[in-house]
A protein has these predicted regions:
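N-terminal secretory signal peptides that target proteins for export/translocation
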Residues: 1-25
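Bacterial N-terminal signal peptides
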Residues: 19-20, 26-41, 46
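Feature marking well-ordered beta-strand scaffolds used for ligand recognition
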Residues: 48-615, 629
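Soluble extracellular-acting proteins and domains
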Residues: 579-684
């Protein structure tokens, strides 16, 4: 039996919740928070999930492989449409071509913007069963992650091949005035013809970015840039420094970059600060690779070593250095000694001696004076929640909480490390801001990490409660169906599904498909729906699967790495009622950037009250006879109008106040009473 290791918490200067601008919870959310606390204390959340078993055997196991014709399995989730990528964004002759990976999603009006390592696609999804390509731009520069704000589109560019002119020929010089690494800003007023208005260069490029809105600044938006590439040469971008901070106080290490975008003049966007949010963190130990992977890598390495190949260890795994890389290194050694012609045996011996230390420096980061290994030097992704003045930073070896009340100067206020986490990847807050979920992208997203022997706490989600100065670990969640060695699978991007009274999330797991799960009780998360396909290839791993699965105005939209765009609908079940789905569909937003998390607010509606009734029934939170009477009273009031409806609802709310004291789920009955009272107030 293995023992779970407890995450280690570091906290610095966390502001009280009352002290954060905009942090006070509206009455309805305060009631929701009380529900969450009640669930954790009483176990009512587990009762909500009781008696609704997932299908057995799991239909996701053993699915037929295929590119566009793989077998599919689903439970409580219906595939509405799959739209293949247009020709310019796929290689029809090479499945899994890394140059044409579909990446993240952003939403505006009837459009979803889908990033692709070769550019952007803008889909009209007003008819979810038949999406239409409304606009596109071929512009290589992986990952091309996207965000939108009004008529502006923001795109992350990190690849060395990215060009200012969006050319497809790449950039081959080590230093070039043509290279673009940073954040592109496009005007998409005419979605059919996206137009670049600014290229904001950054020292490490932009692997991901976070669009941050500020309640106190409506003239600007801010972009938090997370760059994971090596620091650029100052000969290419002035001011860039890859030295240790003790060698150069302006080092790019341990920082993010903040871009201010004046909305009236986006062409004037520029980097305004470089907060060192990672400074002072110690190196965080993580788990080794799976024993099966270590043994398999050693066998491959032994065979390659016997043939004269160069072998190094990367994160504990033997890796064979590619001939292109070693060839360049050997040529450099010939030039270093002033020689010409082919490398000699002495050159090869020198490379063997120097290669492992070189790789260690590349992957382990800088070593500080005294041989101290610091924590991570960059973040992978940040999720901002402006309404509560906080952001969650997923920063390789740590999960962070940031104070973003001054959006140009985010400040770390808490950090947590977990030896079960390999690579902190992304974050999601609960709607009330009192819980936070971090994902672990163990294996980097291109490895199979959901096999039957992979530990359930590795490559999973970690769920925490968040109370002022304290992050408290609760549990892990991992998509439960074992996948094959030919399917890249690990926790990736997802968003909340706006079901009132519950914390539900839809999440992409690459070739593990889409998993929808309830984490209202963070100590006991539970899958309630899924969709999955078989592997791309039954004989080898070809990268594919759901990069992101996001709820948007009634549907779950998924960016499928190799197969295009999926749109899915939740189906009613014992774990999620039609009333709950309909209540979620009441929430409509004009734009959505999941990493700029916005507070979910439900309108006063009878279906919201009925959703709470369904939850009370599922969890045995109110006596059955009393619940029947409440439903009857709601139905009667809905048929009424004017003063009669108002009086009926006010009377019912008062009765529910009295019911709460003896109910098994007091907090949810109070929430229902609040909703009924809101309905009375909305009646004219």
């Amino acid at each position: 039996m293995t023992t779970l290791r407890t995450p280690v918490l570091q906290t610095t200067g966390f502001p009280s919740r009352a002290g954060r601008a905009g942090a006070a919870l509206p009455p309805r959310l305060a009631a929701l928070a009380a529900v969450a606390l009640s669930l954790a204390a009483t176990g009512v959340g587990r009762a909500q999930m009781a008696g609704a078993a997932a299908p057995s055997p799991d239909p996701r196991v053993g699915l037929r492989a295929g590119w566009m014709n793989a077998a599919e399995a689903s439970w409580n989730l219906k595939l509405v449409s799959t739209t293949p990528p247009p020709a310019q964004f796929m290689n029809g002759n090479e499945p899994g071509d890394f140059n044409f990976i579909n990446s993240d999603l952003a939403f505006t009006g009837k459009y979803v913007v889908q990033g692709n390592f070769s550019g952007i696609q803008i889909w009209d999804i007003s008819q979810p069963a038949h999406p239409v390509l409304a606009g596109s731009l071929v512009c290589p520069g992986a990952q091309n992650d996207v965000s939108v704000y009004r008529n502006l589109l923001f795109v992350s560019v990190e690849a060395n091949s990215g060009r200012l002119d969006c050319g497809t020929q790449g950039v081959h010089d080590s230093v070039s005035a043509d290279r673009m690494r940073g954040v592109r800003i496009l005007d998409i007023t005419d979605v059919a013809h996206p137009r670049v208005v600014a290229n904001v260069q950054t020292c490490r490029g932009s692997h991901t970015h976070t669009l941050v809105t500020s309640p106190s600044d409506t003239a600007d938006v801010f972009i938090y840039v997370s760059g994971s590439a090596p620091v650029r040469s100052p000969s290419e971008l002035a001011g860039c420094s890859g030295l240790r901070p003790d060698q150069d106080p302006k080092s790019e290490q341990f920082r993010i970059e903040v871009i201010r975008v004046p909305l009236a003049h986006p062409e004037q966007a520029q980097v305004v600060t470089k907060p060192a949010i990672l400074s002072g963190l110690a190196h965080a130990e993580t788990h080794p690779e799976a024993p099966e992977d270590i043994a398999a890598a050693a066998r491959v390495a032994d065979s390659a070593r016997a043939k004269g190949a160069f072998v190094v260890k990367v994160f504990g795994l033997d890796q064979v250095a590619g001939p292109q890389f070693t060839g360049r290194m050997l040529d450099s050694m010939v030039k270093l000694r002033g020689g010409t012609g082919a490398p000699t045996a002495a050159d090869s011996a020198m490379l063997r001696d120097s290669l492992q230390p070189m790789v260690d420096r590349m992957f382990n980061g800088p070593t500080l004076p005294g041989g101290v290994r610091p924590g991570p030097v960059q973040c992978h992704d940040i999720t901002a929640y402006p309404a509560i003045g906080l952001a969650g930073g997923a920063c390789a070896g740590y999960g962070l909480v940031l104070d973003i009340r001054d959006p140009a100067n985010p400040r770390r206020v808490a950090a947590v490390a977990d030896p079960n986490f390999s690579y902190w990847h992304s974050a999601t807050f609960s709607n009330d801001g009192r819980k936070i979920l971090f994902t672990d992208e163990w294996g980097g997203g291109l490895q199979p990490r959901c096999r039957s022997f992979d530990r359930k706490e590795w490559g999973a989600d970690a769920l925490f409660t968040l109370a002022d100065t304290t992050l408290t670990f609760q549990s892990y969640y991992k998509m439960p169906a074992p996948q094959t060695a030919n399917e890249n699978c690990v926790a990736h991007n997802g968003s909340l599904v706006p079901v009132p009274g519950r914390d539900i999330m839809a999440q992409g797991w690459y070739q593990g498909g889409i998993s929808v799960f309830d984490w209202t009780d963070p100590a006991h998360p539970r899958e309630i729906a899924f969709f999955d396909r078989g592997p791309m290839d039954s004989t080898k791993l070809e990268g594919a699967g759901s990069w992101s699965a996001y709820w948007y105005n009634g549907h779950i939209v998924s960016s499928e790495i190799a197969r295009g765009l999926d749109i899915l609908d939740l189906q009613p079940s014992a774990l999620l009622s039609q009333n709950e789905i309909d209540a979620a569909r009441l929430v409509h937003v004009d734009q959505l950037n999941v990493q700029d998390q916005q507070r979910i607010v439900w309108p006063a509606a009878f279906v919201v009250a009925r959703a709470y009734c369904d939850q009370l029934e599922r969890g045995n939170g109110l006596a059955a006879a009393r619940l029947r009477a409440v439903r009857s009273a709601l139905a009667s009031a809905e048929r009424q109008s004017g003063r009669r409806r108002q009086d009926s609802l006010t009377r019912l709310a008062t009765q529910l106040d009295g019911d709460a004291s003896s109910a098994a789920d007091q907090a949810r009955v109070k929430l229902l009473a609040w909703e009924v009272r809101e309905l009375a107030g909305a009646t004219h």
